[in-house]
UniProtKB/Swiss-Prot annotation:
Functional description taken from the UniProt entry: Key enzyme in heme biosynthesis. Catalyzes the oxidative decarboxylation of propionic acid side chains of rings A and B of coproporphyrinogen III.
Assembly information from the UniProt record: Homodimer.
NCBIfam families attached to this UniProt entry: PRK05330.1
Protein name (database record): Coproporphyrinogen-III oxidase 1, chloroplastic
Site residues, Important for dimerization: 261
Important for dimerization: annotated span: 125-134, 326-361
Expressed in which tissues: Expressed in cotyledons, leaves and roots.
Gene name for this UniProt entry: CPX1
Origin organism lineage: Eukaryota, Viridiplantae, Streptophyta, Embryophyta, Tracheophyta
Entries under Gene3D superfamilies matching the protein: Coproporphyrinogen III oxidase, aerobic (3.40.1500.10)
Organism, as annotated: Arabidopsis thaliana (Mouse-ear cress)
PROSITE patterns reported for this sequence: COPROGEN_OXIDASE
The UniProt record lists the keyword Chloroplast: yes
Length: 386
């Protein structure tokens, strides 16, 4: 997630620059932005991103924001930064509380870290529980500096101004939940906010910002009522803001979670969006909040229904084969994961998305008409579930 040990940038699907199609060079300290600049369509920019090393903490702070962002326990700032941090930490709490309630005993292990110049994060992982094989829910707040080339790439146009290094802020919550029972689906969600400050030597330069995120699920077996329930909750959240959001973001999700070398999707989708700044900022903050608040009602009832179903070794083997696909996507295609691996990110946070166990069999093909085949067919040919 960050170029130097950032939980935020290495979370699944979470790289603040992901919307600008980062490509990676052999040198782990450099990145290439391939978003074309006006009048120079073939220009590939190379730049490094500077972020401080994290420091372990023994307690959760009230906020990870810098003092200059004007946040105190008695007077909460109205800034988008402050409210987004409040939202992602509340989302982390609500999801972890719901998971622990289902587990009936096992608790999340929590790691807290900060950086001397501001920012930090909370990583929570539950492993080998009663219901979940592995569950991770991470939040991060990151301050860093990008070079002027990155700033111009973010603006999407060339400029006569020659700004110096550009400060940026990024915050997000990211989670992957892998249940034990093969009839209970895996869930992934991620919501993030990115903002630049004006370069110090160009104080009038415009501030850039965008939102990204999504919620998607990956079952090993299709229960149509579960799929319809999950997608209906996503649609309800989207429809509160714009009726075009659900069909647009549902297709975006199907396209993003595509395993090219398999010619299939990772799962049965959900919603996904990135680089979203073409609406009112307050509206998008409310939208991201609504989506994050929809995670528990969309997912937990499905797990409650499926967690105690009887299953065979064949069912478990198929679940592990599908988790093999999950591993392939995350390590080969996921922008946040690959960014963290190539730039020295916090490895435990990067790999928290991977299942505890997975399986690969040579030339495995489910028999046509079986429940396993139906799942594979739906991953190859995305459907409209509602």
């Amino acid at each position: 997630m960050a170029s130097h040990s950032s939980t935020l940038l290495s979370s699944p699907t979470f790289a603040p620059f992901s919307s600008h199609r980062l490509h990676y060079s052999p040198n782990p300290s450099t990145l290439r932005f391939s978003r074309p600049i006006r009048n120079k369509p073939n220009l590939a920019l190379r730049c490094s991103v500077s972020i401080e090393k994290e420091v372990p903490e023994t307690e959760r702070p009230f906020t990870f924001l810098r003092d200059s962002d004007d946040v105190t326990p008695s007077s909460s700032s109205s800034s988008v930064r402050a409210r987004f941090e409040t939202m992602i930490r509340a989302a982390q709490d609500s999801v972890c509380d719901a998971i622990e309630a289902i587990e009936g005993g096992p608790k999340f292990k929590e790691d807290v870290w900060s950086r001397p110049g501001g920012g930090g994060g909370i990583s929570r992982v539950l492993q080998d529980g009663n219901v979940f094989e592995k569950a991770g829910v991470n939040v991060s707040v990151v301050y860093g500096v990008m070079p002027p080339e990155a700033y111009r790439a973010a603006k999407g146009s060339a400029s006569d101004q020659k700004p110096g290094p550009v400060p940026f802020f990024a915050a997000g919550v990211s989670s992957v939940l892998h249940p034990k029972n093969p009839f209970a689906p895996t869930l992934h969600f991620n919501y993030r906010y990115f903002e630049t400050d004006a370069p110090k030597d160009v104080p009038g330069a415009p501030r850039q910002w965008w939102f990204g995120g999504g919620t998607d699920f990956t079952p090993a077996y299709i229960f149509e009522e579960d799929v319809k329930h999950f997608h209906s909750i996503q649609k309800q959240a989207c429809d509160k803001f714009d009726p075009s959001f659900y069909p647009r973001f549902k297709k975006w999700c199907d396209d993003y979670f595509y395993i090219k070398h398999r010619d299939e999707r990772r799962g049965l989708g959900g919603i996904f969006f990135d680089d979203l700044n073409d609406y009112d900022q307050e509206m998008l903050l409310s939208f991201a909040t609504e989506c994050a608040n929809s995670v528990v009602p969309a997912y937990i009832p499905i797990v409650e229904k499926r967690k105690d179903m009887e299953f065979t070794e064949q069912h478990k083997a198929w679940q592990q084969l599908r988790r093999g696909r999950y591993v392939e996507f995350n390590l080969v295609y996921d922008r946040g994961t690959t960014f963290g691996l190539k730039t020295g990110g916090r490895i435990e946070s990067i790999l928290v998305s991977l299942p505890l166990s997975a399986r690969w069999e040579y030339d495995h093909k489910p028999e046509e008409g079986t429940e396993e085949w139906k799942l594979l067919d739906a991953c190859i040919n995305p459907k409209e579930w509602i």
